[in-house]
Curated annotation (Swiss-Prot):
Keywords attached to this entry: Ligase
Keyword Ligase: yes
Motif Conserved DDXXE motif boundaries: 419-423
Entry text on domains: The conserved DDXXE motif is essential for catalytic activity.
Protein name: Arginine-containing cyclodipeptide synthase pthA
Pathway: Secondary metabolite biosynthesis
Cysteine-cysteine disulfides: none
Family (UniProt): Belongs to the arginine-containing cyclodipeptide synthase family.
UniProt KW Ligase keyword: yes
Biological function: Arginine-containing cyclodipeptide synthase; part of the cluster that mediates the biosynthesis of a highly modified cyclo-arginine-aspartate dipeptide (cRD). Within the pathway, pthA acts as the scaffold-generating enzyme and is responsible for formation of the cyclo-Arg-Asp diketopiperazine (cRW) from L-arginyl-tRNA(Arg) + L-aspartyl-tRNA(Asp). Additional enzymes from the cluster then further modify the cyclo-Arg-Asp diketopiperazine (cRW) scaffold.
Catalytic activity field: L-aspartyl-tRNA(Asp) + L-arginyl-tRNA(Arg) = cyclo(L-arginyl-L-aspartyl) + tRNA(Asp) + tRNA(Arg) + 2 H(+)
Origin species: Penicillium thymicola
Amino acid sequence: MSTLYLLANLRNRPDGRHSIDFGSLSARESDPVKMPHEITGLFSSDYCSSTSTTLEAEESEAYSKALSRNKRAAGILEHFLNGEQAAAHPSVCLQDRARLRLCEEAILVGAPRGTATRAREGIASYDKMEFLFPGSRQRKSIQMLHVSCPSLQPGATLLDSHSGSVHDSITILSGMCLFTRKILNSTTTNGRLDGQKLRHMPPTLYEMECIARLSAIIADVTTLTQSNFGEDNHPAVNIVLDLPSWHYYQFIEDCIKSDTCSLEEAIDWTEAIKLRRQQLASVLKKAVWHELGQRQVAHKSTLKAIQISPESTVVDELIKETLQRGHQPRLDDILHALSGTPHSLWPQFYSLLRDRDKPHSIRDLGFLFYVFQVVRPALLKAIPCQEAPSSKAPACEQPNLHRGQRQCLPQRPLIISLDDRAERKIYSQAHSLLLRLSRSSNQLVNPTLVQLYMPRRVYIDGNKDGQRLYWHDPSPVLPLLEGTKEQQRRDARNHDHHRRELQQTDILTELYGRDCSANIQGWFKEAGLC
């Protein structure tokens, strides 16, 4: 029996505290429901296909369809990333080339029927994939991934038969939120803004767990996409980390409009948000560089840069300047600033939007900006045939034309996103816009979007409502390690909780190992957050 992945269950207790326990999901062929993790709707693929499954017929069919659908997509991804030669000679290429191996095992997750999460996310299957790195310190990394790649045709490859690149550029895109929803709400209570509370907030469980989970998969995918190229034929590889800042203005907009807070409070609050974003970006970048180093590609010339939310600064600055002048930011002013920035790609993005998709509020714009970050790498390549690439663009974003490549040929940027499945609305809209861009009569670009989603490692109340950690993280309150009912009663009588309180780093150690936990704690200290 093999363990597929480790998980945690965060529970709301009757006494108002939170408790947490840990478990693992194993590959079982016929064992019905002796599921120690007690997570509703979470099963191994072996259990779902077993004749002894207790799933209702309709539910069993839904799980089976999800499993089959993702297995097909994962197979396309495996062939795509490994290239023609690896597909033809897997035993030979395995010895000296990084490659991806799709395994039989998978896990399936679905919130209970009738919940909003089930309606929004459906049932997702995550296939076990082994990233193999011969010759590096970390020779193998295992990920459970849900794959969506509608623009990839079966047989498509990243490498051609001569190990050359099919794509002109590769962008690895991921991101995370700041704080938790609960903490942000607590700083806007009764219309008053508490920026100082944000400034002194220690790292949340959500933030630390998200960095641990993202950094490894970012490094895995980046390494695989660049390590098989030679020095003379590699495409530009960029990592883009999208962390929000001005997007949180929606939290305080009503306070400002109703005059329940001062503009000075609003400025202090937004500056605290920007500081947190800067700190988290620093930690996440260090975590990614560390993981890349473990795979021995941290300083390879193919990796151009790690960028943080390109073109977002202009909105931050406009909101701050507007508040300092004693005015409230307006949507039209922000759109004008985005369009008026030299070398901005926002005008091209905005022209792709239908009228019904254009923003009517700053809240709408915040969502669209996430979509913009996904589409932006393709816009960088969407150059009319008669025009040369702009020499004024940042060096890390310069188009990379290989020897013998004609400039009037369609550019083929590859965008690989790594995220939580709850965010798939962003990528669905981005995919539609990329299709519209590729069909444009005046742009020569043929982008490919590959969406990879990771399963959650921390579930809330046994996944009974499909809730996410970001919304229900109890931080800064520490959860209690779940004990027996007798221990819980004894603790309640003695008011003795401290002996079983778990720090966020304790939880990381259980899920990701001691080294990962210690490293992340150290990087947070360097950023001034521990």
